[in-house]
Structures are given as C-alpha cells and as structure tokens.
Amino acid sequence: MGHNDSVETMDEISNPNNILLPHDGTGLDATGISGSQEPYGMVDVLNPDSLKDDSNVDEPLIEDIVNPSLDPEGVVSAEPSNEVGTPLLQQPISLDHVITRPASAGGVYSIGNSSTSSAAKLSDGDLTNATDPLLNNAHGHGQPSSESQSHSNGYHKQGQSQQPLLSLNKRKLLAKAHVDKHHSKKKLSTTRARPAFVNKLWSMVNDKSNEKFIHWSTSGESIVVPNRERFVQEVLPKYFKHSNFASFVRQLNMYGWHKVQDVKSGSMLSNNDSRWEFENENFKRGKEYLLENIVRQKSNTNILGGTTNAEVDIHILLNELETVKYNQLAIAEDLKRITKDNEMLWKENMMARERHQSQQQVLEKLLRFLSSVFGPNSAKTIGNGFQPDLIHELSDMQVNHMSNNNHNNTGNINPNAYHNETDDPMANVFGPLTPTDQGKVPLQDYKLRPRLLLKNRSMSSSSSSNLNQRQSPQNRIVGQSPPPQQQQQQQQQQGQPQGQQFSYPIQGGNQMMNQLGSPIGTQVGSPVGSQYGNQYGNQYSNQFGNQLQQQTSRPALHHGSNGEIRELTPSIVSSDSPDPAFFQDLQNNIDKQEESIQEIQDWITKLNPGPGEDGNTPIFPELNMPSYFANTGGSGQSEQPSDYGDSQIEELRNSRLHEPDRSFEEKNNGQKRRRAA
C-alpha cells in the first residue's frame, strides 16, 4: 500500500485498510493517530516481508496490535484462537501464518521520548511485574487503576503505567477451565439412584449388631432371618416405621426377592417354622455395585401386557364403536316396530271389545224379545240355540218357581201363573228334568214378560168325566193329592215309555204335529217350527199314532182352585157373555209384539243393512199371529164351540189374524187409529 498524505480521524475511518500505524516510535496524539513521515498501512503490517528493506525498524510482536478495549472478551474466551476481530472488521482475519518478531516493551503505541528501552523483551522482570494487574483483571479479582481511568481519551499512559498484552498461548494457560454444566447434569442424571429400601436392607444385613437377627447365608447369595419374632421386635423398628413382618416380606417380593425353601422345611425333622431365607440375584455379599440393578417390579397388569403402557390399536376401537352404533340403531328400529305393533294391537283389542259389547247387547235384546214372545217356555222352544244343561236349568227353574207359588197360595191359585207340561207339546222335547238341574238360573231370566194364557170362564160338564184319565204327574198342581184312581193310572203310565205320557188331544200323528208346529212356525216365521214338526211328527205318528187316536179330541182340562175346570188348549174359547177386558189384553199384547218386532228390525238394519233397509220391506215376512186363532176348517183343527161365531170374535179374527202382510208403517197407522177409537 502506498503512502497517503492525508490523515483521517478515528470517527472518519470507514475502511480498516486506511488505518496507519507508526513505525518510528512516534505515538498518538489526542486527536488520533499522529502524523508521520513514513507511516505503514494495515496491509504492510500483515505482510511483514514488505518491511524487511527497512533496517532501522524493529520487528514488533503481532499480538501488540490487538487492542484490549476493542476485544474485551478475548481474555475470558472459552476457546481462544489466532483470529483477530474488531468492531471495525466485519469478518475475523486468521493470524496463523504471521511470524512473531521481537519488539519494544511499549509496543507500537509507545511514545518516542519514553524512558523504556526499545529493546526490552517479554522475558524481563519489569514486564512480568507489569502483567500482574492485567492477570488480576482477567480473573475478575482486581479493578482498573485510577491513573488509567483518569484519561478520558481511552489510551494508556506512557512508561510503567502501560499494561502490555499477553500472548495467546499464555492466555490459554491462564484461562479457567470451562465446565459444561448441561452435559454434567446429563451425566449425573443417568446415574441410577438406589431405592431407600435396598439401602436400608444392605446396611441392616452388614451391621454386626444385627447378626443374631439377620445375616448372610454361608454362600453369601441370600439373607437369612433365623427368628422371625425377635427380628420383628429388635430390628424392624430401628429401620422402618412399622413392626409388621408381612409388610417387610411384601416389599422384598416387590423388589425381586424370592423365598428359598429349605430342604428340611415341611419334614418331621424341622421343628422351627420361624426361619426365613430370601434370595436376589443382585443382592450378594461384597457386591454392592449390583444394588443399582435392583428396581421395583411393575404391577401384574403391566407384566401381563395390560393396557397401562401397551399401545392400543385405534382401528380396533373404531370398528367396535361402529358395530355398537349399528347394533344400537337396529335395536332402536326394533323398538319402534314393536311399539307400533303394540299400539295397533291395542286398537284392534278396543275395537273387538266394542263389537263384542254391541253384539252382546243385540243378543240380549233378541233374547228378551223371544222371551216376551214365547213366554216362560222360550228356553225350551228355542232349545237348539242353547246347551242342554242351560235348557234344563231354565225349565226346572220355571217349574220350581211356579210350584213354590202354588204351594204358598193353595187357597187362591193364579191360573195365569200355572204351567202345564202335558199340554205343552214342547215340554218333553229335551227329556225330563233332573233334580240336580234345579235352582241354577235366576228368576229374572225367564220372567221378563208374562205369558198370555187364555182361559175358559165356563165349566164344561162333558170334560169332567175324563179328567182323571187326562191328569198326569206333570200337569197337576203341587200340594194337591190326586184321587186313588188317578194314582193307579199314574203307576201304569210309569212303566210305559216316555213318549206315551203325552195326552194331547189329536186324531192322528200328522194332525198332532200340525198343532205342534203351528204355534212355533206361524209365530216366529223361522224353520224352528218346521224342524220340530219334521223331526218329531213322523216319530210320534209311527210310535204312538194308534194310541193317541183312541183318546178323545177334546182339549185337556185341569182342576182349578175352587173345583173349576179350565181348558189349557191354545185356542180361543168364547162364552155366552165375552169379557171386554179379555180383548183389551189381547190387543195390548199384540201391540207389544209388533213394537218388539219393529225394534228388532231396526237393530238388524243398523247392524247389517239388507232387504229391510228402507223400512218398508219386512225382515220377517212370515211373522204372523198364531194360526190357531184362525178357523181354516181342516180336519186337524178341533171343533170350535157354537158361540165362536160371535160378531166381536169374528171381527177380531178377520181384522187381525187373517189380514194380508202390510208394511210396518201401515200397521203403526192402524194401531194409532184403533187406539184413538
């Protein structure tokens, strides 16, 4: 680098190559680097070969160019090197290739008029004394001198107050050894600490005072407790906070000790059960370094591969969760379906219950109507629709009730409440009644409406002669004793078949069945009458036709309460002076029957609309009054008395019994007109 006449101050220096260093011993003034005739640049200093031509110039030490004020960390650096770096130099410069040369003790910054010799070396005693304060400052034991602090320009004074710098090698020797605290902590942490129980057990076994209670075995591989009770009393309280031998054994097992079974244990030679011996492969006499391998065993769940430290497969859990969700949805769907089916079943049950109640009401009304039409014998008349037991019970209750009434009222018997089984053609259709059938049906079942019984107010003298022949056990009143002649006749009839006990006045089998079927077929208009007629007509005509023809054609008679003979045949018998109340009762009964028929037709139309839905077409077109009110003049009909041609009876017969089938409206209108008249 060539000479440069211009001198720049320290503040104006921007390029480190422009720094000029003196070589003739001149120092620095207060304003900066003093002017010099032959200054050298930084490059010349770094290349000492360029200065070999000048013989008058001393060779300074390269370490003197380092300003301690610019490199305060260089003294305490942990890893010093031969690199020079200042705040002015952006990058450090390696100085390994620089060859050291002798220089003056004052260094390149010494002043020319200084008393210090320029040939002083680093090995002089003065230099060594001068370096002591610097070493103290480097170690942090001293403070900078007051003289060095008095100069505000930051430069050292001349002479002995100047503190020269040390070489890099000496600085390495004087530097304090650096300790890596983080690395040392890591090494300390790797050292395994022994458990407190293991340390206590080691000191316990090796203590000579405890040799009587616990000691090493002969081989030194195990520890022996010769007397358990004394060990618990003498040793355990000194080392532990308890005196429980079971707890001590549990801790031994927890840290890997195992009980050693003695050869004599369990035999008859061993009388001492208090001796215990434990063994651990890392607990041996004289081998304390093995204690670091003794650790507390993990729990059984961890040893067996439990879920505490084991890795759980998340996919298995997700699959199981999806399966659970699917099953839950299926169960929810099944629950909804079951709930819906339950609701539907409840609705169907309620509907069926309502239908059952309505049908039961209709059946009850039908039974009441039939009972009102046929009277107390309705159970026998419509017996095909009932069970035989119920029919027997109803019939027996009728007879029993009327017999009790007749027995209580022997002085005045009501002829309307009398029931004659002999005169009733359907009395023995279902067989005779048994005593066990009595008293099983309440009275209200057959006493819904009283039956109309027509009576004869005059006594026939011709009928009294055959009274004893017509009377039987079924048609006499309870409480009256029959005459001796009648008792003999009854005994003779008991030996005969049951069908021979009928004494109904007909002239032939077919004629009898005409009268049997007429009250049923004409009243109900159903196949019930014809069924009985076809079923029993031929039977009676074949078996008992000849016998019944021998009987008289007159109707059956019966004694009254005052000796009066009453006729019980289903025919109207007129007298010389007919009673107007009789016709009024007959008219009332006919009106009631028509009202009942109309009510049943309305029920059937409401439940099952059919041909009678418009109200004009009758549902029972064959439902007429009994044919025995009509005088057809057939051979099967009994002869009517001479007074049957009375004008009132003829009018009743022509207007009521043989009128053509009319609509119910016309009948109702006719009823209203008759009632008004």
UniProtKB/Swiss-Prot annotation:
Give the residue ranges for region: Involved in trimerization.
Answer: 320-373
- Name the domain of life this protein comes from: Eukaryota
| Biased amino acid composition, Low complexity | 400-416, 457-501
Q: Does the keyword Transcription apply?
A: yes
Q: Where is this region: Activatory?
A: 466-677
Q: Which molecular-function annotation in GO is an example for this chain?
A: DNA-binding transcription factor activity
| Protein's UniProt name | Heat shock transcription factor
